[in-house]
């Protein structure tokens, strides 16, 4: 029987994984590459059935290594032509210029037909491909690489039982997670158990943030903040530097930068939000590597805990979930008590809950900067023993009730918002 610590380590392994490019289009590339390998050839007929949240998150984001292509059809074509499904979310990392031209030629044939999946599953992908002689059906539910069904010529190759109504059903049981357990474990866990994964987080995510500050990506929110620090318009402080650093990573990723990132809860933007402000804070305050890693442990697990309630994809901005993890980590690294960590999370969730997700795109970087600024405010309030009170809007009687309330808001209250956003984006 697994111990609680073993379950937590397994959760980290599931949720913190490398991915190149925004995870929703990359999930399409992965599904396409897998289906093509089973078919044996590039198909001449492709039908894809997608949930609204997948459509929303693929529509406006640049696909890495595609030489600037954007959207559903290019994401699928990249997987069909250039993908290696064995690399999972790094599926198109080795694409060549010649393969990109093949992708463009394939797209010119207009062989891909996109359909809206009518069910309630938020993350749903089904590919049906054919080469005239053989056909393959491949289905993904709930998480980006969770293949639940594969058919070839109507013969079942894979059928995985999956609870359609529970978006966490394919994952390790999250009941082990609570803010109290995360806080206590962060203080006592053997650092060698978590050092390898978080060293990789530091290395990968710092690299793309550095690139975002050097190049021209998206609306350059990260570079803009840094430039204004240097001009003396913004203060030369850790809050501004942290917002700049994390935003720069998103600027680059949303604009197709081919550098990989370590994701959190299925999202690169969440992975960067949960890590880069903490990395920058630790550097500015000369904290030890162990202190940084324990801080990252807090930020990632709080993010995962909140996202477990909110859901993989919804109308609720995932960067705000990750910003709550940042607030917890900053408070923890300041030496804050458990109560102060709870207060910091309460402050940010009481402030920014309701920020919408209207798809993956350049403006995600701006939402990340907003979340990080709020995380610093939430932290300083908590350290000063100031906190939003129970009954103030969605704030519950304790932190766990507040997190559950946020989940209810995202899953139930914002369902209509999600549908309206998709309608606006596709009209």
Curated annotation (Swiss-Prot):
<dbReference type="GO" id="GO:0080146">
    <property type="term" value="F:L-cysteine desulfhydrase activity"/>
</dbReference>
<comment type="similarity">
    <text>Belongs to the UPF0597 family.</text>
</comment>
<dbReference type="InterPro" id="IPR021144">
    <property type="entry name" value="UPF0597"/>
</dbReference>
<dbReference type="Pfam" id="PF03313">
    <property type="entry name" value="SDH_alpha"/>
</dbReference>
<dbReference type="InterPro" id="IPR005130">
    <property type="entry name" value="Ser_deHydtase-like_asu"/>
</dbReference>
<protein>
    <recommendedName>
        <fullName>UPF0597 protein FN1147</fullName>
    </recommendedName>
</protein>
<dbReference type="GO" id="GO:0019450">
    <property type="term" value="P:L-cysteine catabolic process to pyruvate"/>
</dbReference>
């Amino acid at each position: 029987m697994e111990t609680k610590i073993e379950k937590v380590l397994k959760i980290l392994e599931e949720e913190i994984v490398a991915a190149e490019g925004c995870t929703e289009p990359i999930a399409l590339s992965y599904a396409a590459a897998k289906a093509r390998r089973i078919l044996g050839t590039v198909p001449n007929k492709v039908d894809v059935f997608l949930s609204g949240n997948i459509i929303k998150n693929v529509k406006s984001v640049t696909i890495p290594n595609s030489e600037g292509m954007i959207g559903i059809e290019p994401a699928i074509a990249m997987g069909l032509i250039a993908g290696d499904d064995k690399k999972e979310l790094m599926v198109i990392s080795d694409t060549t210029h010649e393969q990109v031209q093949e992708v463009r030629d394939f797209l010119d044939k207009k062989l891909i037909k996109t359909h809206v999946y009518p069910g309630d599953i938020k993350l749903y992908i089904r590919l049906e491909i054919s080469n005239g002689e053989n056909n393959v059906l491949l289905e993904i539910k709930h998480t980006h690489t969770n293949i639940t069904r594969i058919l070839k010529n109507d013969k079942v190759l894979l059928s995985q039982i999956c609870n359609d109504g529970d978006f966490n059903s394919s994952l390790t049981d999250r009941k082990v997670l609570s803010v109290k357990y995360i806080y206590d474990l962060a203080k006592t866990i053997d650092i060698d158990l978590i050092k390898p994964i978080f060293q990789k987080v530091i290395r990968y995510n710092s690299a793309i943030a550095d690139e975002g500050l050097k190049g021209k990506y998206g609306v350059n929110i990260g570079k803009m903040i840094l430039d204004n620090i240097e001009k003396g318009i913004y203060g030369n402080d850790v809050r501004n530097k942290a917002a700049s650093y994390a935003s720069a990573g998103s600027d680059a990723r949303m604009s197709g930068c081919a550098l990989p990132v370590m994701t959190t809860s299925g999202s690169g933007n969440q992975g960067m939000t949960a890590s880069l402000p903490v990395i920058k804070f630790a550097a500015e305050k000369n904290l030890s590597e162990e202190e940084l890693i324990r801080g990252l442990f807090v930020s990632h697990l709080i993010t995962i805990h909140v996202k477990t309630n909110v859901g993989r994809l919804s109308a609720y901005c995932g960067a705000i979930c990750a910003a709550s993890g940042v607030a917890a980590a900053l408070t923890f690294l300041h030496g804050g008590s458990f109560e102060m960590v709870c207060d910091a999370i309460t402050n940010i969730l009481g402030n920014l809950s309701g920020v919408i997700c209207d798809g993956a795109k350049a403006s995600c970087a701006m939402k990340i900067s907003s979340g990080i600024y709020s995380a610093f405010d939430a932290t300083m309030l908590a350290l000063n023993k100031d906190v939003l009170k129970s009954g103030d809007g969605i704030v519950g009687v304790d932190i766990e009730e507040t997190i559950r309330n946020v989940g209810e808001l995202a899953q139930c209250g914002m369902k209509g918002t999600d549908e309206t956003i998709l309608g606006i984006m596709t009209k």
